[in-house]
Amino acid sequence: MIKKRGGPSDAGRGSEPAMALRELTAQALFFELDGVLVEQARLTAEGRVPWLPGALEALASIDPELFLTFVGTARSDIAFGELRERDFQRFCERFVQDCDEAQVPIRKIYSCPYHPKGRQRFRKESVFRKPAPGIYKMAQQEFDLNLGRSWVVGHTTTDILAGQRAGMGTCLVLTGKAGRDGSYQVDPHRVVQDVRHAVAEILRFEVAERS
């Protein structure tokens, strides 16, 4: 079940300590890769990045002075031997190259290749496997992020629950699995058509908050 609610908030918004924290720490946007930015099941070591329509342009519209941009992705395909780790690394290199050419400053790609039913060394539980918020907590430490003023954009209920557990705003896109995976009951802040609408909606929300 998916419901919509308001926007993210800091405890005590409007108080001097909360406002000081907002100014001293960075806001971030986290995007799942498959089903949000690129087509599902089409990650390969060679060839073009299978961008979803308008996804790269959406990333390019993000003001780097307002948000740091990250990718946080679960890679069960690596865990189950469907994609080699080195091939995923090569894919990420092409992904970052496309972003660089579009002047999109991707700060880091976080990924988790582990699954409790995975193969060999990839078979284990991990705090970085969604819906655990480990990926976001690591980014918070590495980049001094204010997760209470940050957002995650995903296409599964697992993505949304992970964002909620990190205390972030959550935006579900109706591409990829479109929240129909049925893994969890979630209550995203926004439900939108695709990543273009997600970025536009988040930016509108932030402008309204700052006015």
Segments from the language model and where they lie:
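Acidic, Mg2+-coordinating phosphoryl-transfer loop and its flanking beta/alpha structural elements
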Residues: G148, V152-R190
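Conserved Lys-Pro-Asp/Glu-containing loop-to-beta segment of HAD-superfamily phosphomonoesterases
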Residues: V127-I160
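Short acidic-hydrophobic, aromatic-tinged amphipathic segments that line or gate anion-handling sites
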Residues: H189-A198
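Short helix-capping segments at alpha-helix termini
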Residues: D100-P105, D144
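Active-site neighborhood of HAD-like aspartate-dependent phosphohydrolases
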Residues: I2-F70
